[in-house]
From Swiss-Prot:
Signal sequence, start to end: 1-24
This protein's domain notes: The ice-binding site may be formed by 7 T/S-X-T motifs.
Motif Probable ice-binding motif (T/S-X-T) 4: chain residues: 154-156
Bilayer disposition of the protein: Single-pass membrane protein
Motif segment (Probable ice-binding motif (T/S-X-T) 6): 198-200
Taxonomic source organism: Nostoc sp. (strain HG1)
Residue numbers covered by motif Probable ice-binding motif (T/S-X-T) 2: 65-67
Motif Probable ice-binding motif (T/S-X-T) 5 per record, residues: 180-182
PEP C-terminal anchor: annotated segments: 240-263
Domain of life per record: Bacteria
Protein's UniProt name: Ice-binding protein
Length: 269
């Protein structure tokens, strides 16, 4: 009976882990509609310099110009001034307005995001927002944790700034920006940028677990990587809680569990 229970425990852990990842990704897709299929979406144009990589599709609407591809690589499809890109912009605008309508939990106006550790919620800036250093997002073990940053005007990050997570990945991070975003050189960004005007990714900026979506203006790139794939780097992982804290932690310990029982599977139960 113990041997059977061990088998079931591993199977349940796999199912639970897969389910949590699917639900979290579905929540992000639901918010963005067809815009979720794009890594970069520009309103007037998308321009690139250097060997950038976009792991999803690239779109431009209502403009029609996407330059610098190649040398940049787009693993998805390039859509310019067509019905696919137009619908993505409609969905982008819908998501932008929905995010803007949410009631904030906390006003961060005047604070630098760098050095803060934030839990899921809606955070607002009446005007501009700045990130200098490291912003930590604590998911509290919730795979569907939602972080929304409502920014009245601009978002600017200093060189080599970063966003990291603890207690899980963060597929549902949204920056709703009233005008434009400029990410400083070497910034390691995480989350979806929905800017009313433009987005500038300077040299060496990477966006993980997110997208660069500009409604009316340009997206400007320079040797960047943009991917909606989510992951937690080893040094950013939190200590796994005791087993009785939540079913969600089964996913966190899945790899260790599989290694522990690998030899037993080979020998038979």
């Amino acid at each position: 009976m113990l041997k059977i229970n061990r088998k079931y425990a591993i199977i349940l852990a796999i199912v639970a882990f897969s389910s949590f990842q699917t639900e979290a990704k579905a929540a992000s897709i639901s918010m963005l509609g067809t815009a979720s299929n794009f890594g970069v979406l520009g309103g007037s144009t998308v321009t690139n310099t250097g060997p950038s990589v976009i792991t999803e599709s690239l779109g431009v609407s209502t403009g029609s110009s996407a330059t610098g591809f190649p040398p940049a690589i787009v693993n998805g499809t390039i859509f310019t001034s067509d019905t696919v890109a137009a619908q993505a912009q409609v969905d982008n605008a819908t998501a932008y307005n929905k995010l803007a309508s949410l009631i904030p939990n906390k006003d961060l106006t005047g604070l630098d995001l760098g050095g803060l550790t934030l839990t899921p919620g809606v955070y607002s800036f009446s005007s501009s927002a700045q990130l200098t250093g490291i912003l930590t997002l604590d998911n509290l073990g919730d795979p569907n944790a939602l972080f929304v940053f409502q920014i009245g005007s601009t978002l600017t990050t200093a060189s080599n700034s970063s966003i990291v997570t603890t207690n899980g990945d963060a597929p549902n991070v949204f920056f709703q920006i009233g005008s434009s975003a400029t990410l400083g050189t070497g910034t390691q960004f995480m989350g979806n940028i929905l800017a009313l005007t433009s987005i500038t990714l300077t040299t060496g900026v990477n966006i993980d677990c997110g997208r660069a979506l500009a409604q009316n203006g340009a997206v400007t790139m320079d040797t960047n990587k943009v991917s909606n794939a989510c992951y937690t780097k080893p040094q950013e992982k939190a200590v796994v809680p005791e087993p009785d804290s939540s079913l969600a932690v089964l996913g966190s310990g899945l790899v260790s569990l599989l290694f522990a029982f690998r030899k037993r599977f080979r020998k038979g139960w």
